[in-house]
Regions:
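Charged- and aromatic-enriched interaction segments used to assemble
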Residues: 36-151
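A generic structural signal for short beta-strands and their flanking turns/coil linkers
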Residues: 11-13, 225-227, 275
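Acidic, small/polar-enriched beta strand-loop surface segments
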Residues: 7, 104, 116-221, 225-270, ...
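Short, surface-exposed ligand-recognition loops at beta-strand->loop->(often short) alpha-helix junctions
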Residues: 2-6, 59-62, 233-236
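A generic structural motif
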Residues: 1, 38-45, 126-128, 228-231, ...
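Short beta-strand and beta-hairpin "edge-sheet" elements
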Residues: 16-44, 245-276
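Assembly/oligomerization scaffold segments
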Residues: 1-50, 142-157
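Glycine- and charge-enriched low-complexity intrinsically disordered segments
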Residues: 60, 276-286
């Protein structure tokens, strides 16, 4: 932007962005850069920026949403919808960690013990935590769909080389009995196809070993599928964590299903609005 006598702001000033009356972004100025030509470049972040704060925290018997609510109260952050994550974390020590990492650890524990994924984001000045099933863009019969007409180019990769496991083994050293408990879940069909790809870890006191190996196998016993889309027609509802329908012919395979948005970059230029998306998941048919 160009400097003038109307704009008066500094670090910490609130920034609101709307497009055609639609709320897009609410945050605060963190950095400004000025050139000799009086051009000003401004960097603003939403409330998620404050989750970079570091601390040491001990908590007991809280779900991830309860822990997030506690942190938000301690740091003066506004919250919106915080859906019940269900899984109770018996005891945890977070030492010299960012609030981001603490929350991610709580959500990871929920995911690996239940198979349920939750998404944290800032919705125009309010921290929301929602189940993945609540993150579809649009509504039934009118979901946002990306196809060959709405994106310029794509790059697709499928793999069993990263975060794919067809056998899960967890152990727990039971001090009361003096025995090591071993829990295993596996998919013999995929072991025959890919060989043994084993995930191993130890259990903490209070964790349900059988439930956790079953949840982990369900989570990891599949190919990873990643898709990058460039210059997609912009939609302000799309953010990291959204679920969008993708309908693309990849040559020998056709994709038509929901995919998870891992990262999203919106570009606004005059009357144009584009997105670059990184997606994962989805089922391939045909």
């Amino acid at each position: 932007m160009l400097r003038d006598d109307v704009l008066d702001f500094s670090e910490g000033s609130a920034v609101r962005m709307k497009e055609n009356g639609e709320e897009v972004f609410f945050g605060f100025v963190f950095k400004q850069q000025r050139s000799k030509e009086q051009l000003i470049s401004v960097t603003a972040y939403d409330q998620l920026r404050y989750l970079k704060n570091k601390d040491t925290i001990v908590y007991e018997n809280k779900t991830a949403d309860q822990f997030l609510r506690m942190l938000a109260a301690d740091y003066g952050l506004n919250t919106g919808v915080l859906e019940n994550t269900g899984y109770i974390i018996e005891s945890r020590v977070e030492e010299n960690s960012s609030l981001f990492d603490m929350i991610q650890n709580a959500l990871d524990l929920t995911l690996t013990n239940t198979g349920e994924m939750f998404v944290l984001y800032d919705d125009f000045g309010r921290l929301d935590l929602r189940h993945l099933s609540s993150m579809a863009v649009g509504r039934q019969g009118a979901y946002l769909m990306v196809d060959e007409e709405t994106c310029e180019t794509f790059d697709y990769v499928s793999s069993i080389d990263d975060n794919t496991f067809n056998k899960v083994k967890l152990t727990y050293d039971n001090e009361e009995t003096g025995f090591r408990e071993v829990y295993i879940a596996q998919d013999s069909g995929n072991i025959n196809r890919w060989g043994i790809l084993q995930y191993f870890d130890t259990l903490k006191k209070g964790e349900n070993g059988q439930a956790k190996v079953d949840a982990l196998l369900k989570l990891y016993n599949k190919k990873t599928r990643n898709l990058k889309l460039t210059n997609v027609l912009g939609d302000n509802r799309v953010r990291a964590g959204s679920m969008i329908v993708v309908n693309l012919d990849l040559g020998d395979m056709k994709l038509k299903n929901f995919m998870l948005v891992e990262s999203c970059r919106h570009t606004y230029k005059e009357s144009m609005h584009w997105m670059d998306l990184t997606l994962r998941g989805g089922e391939f048919v045909g």
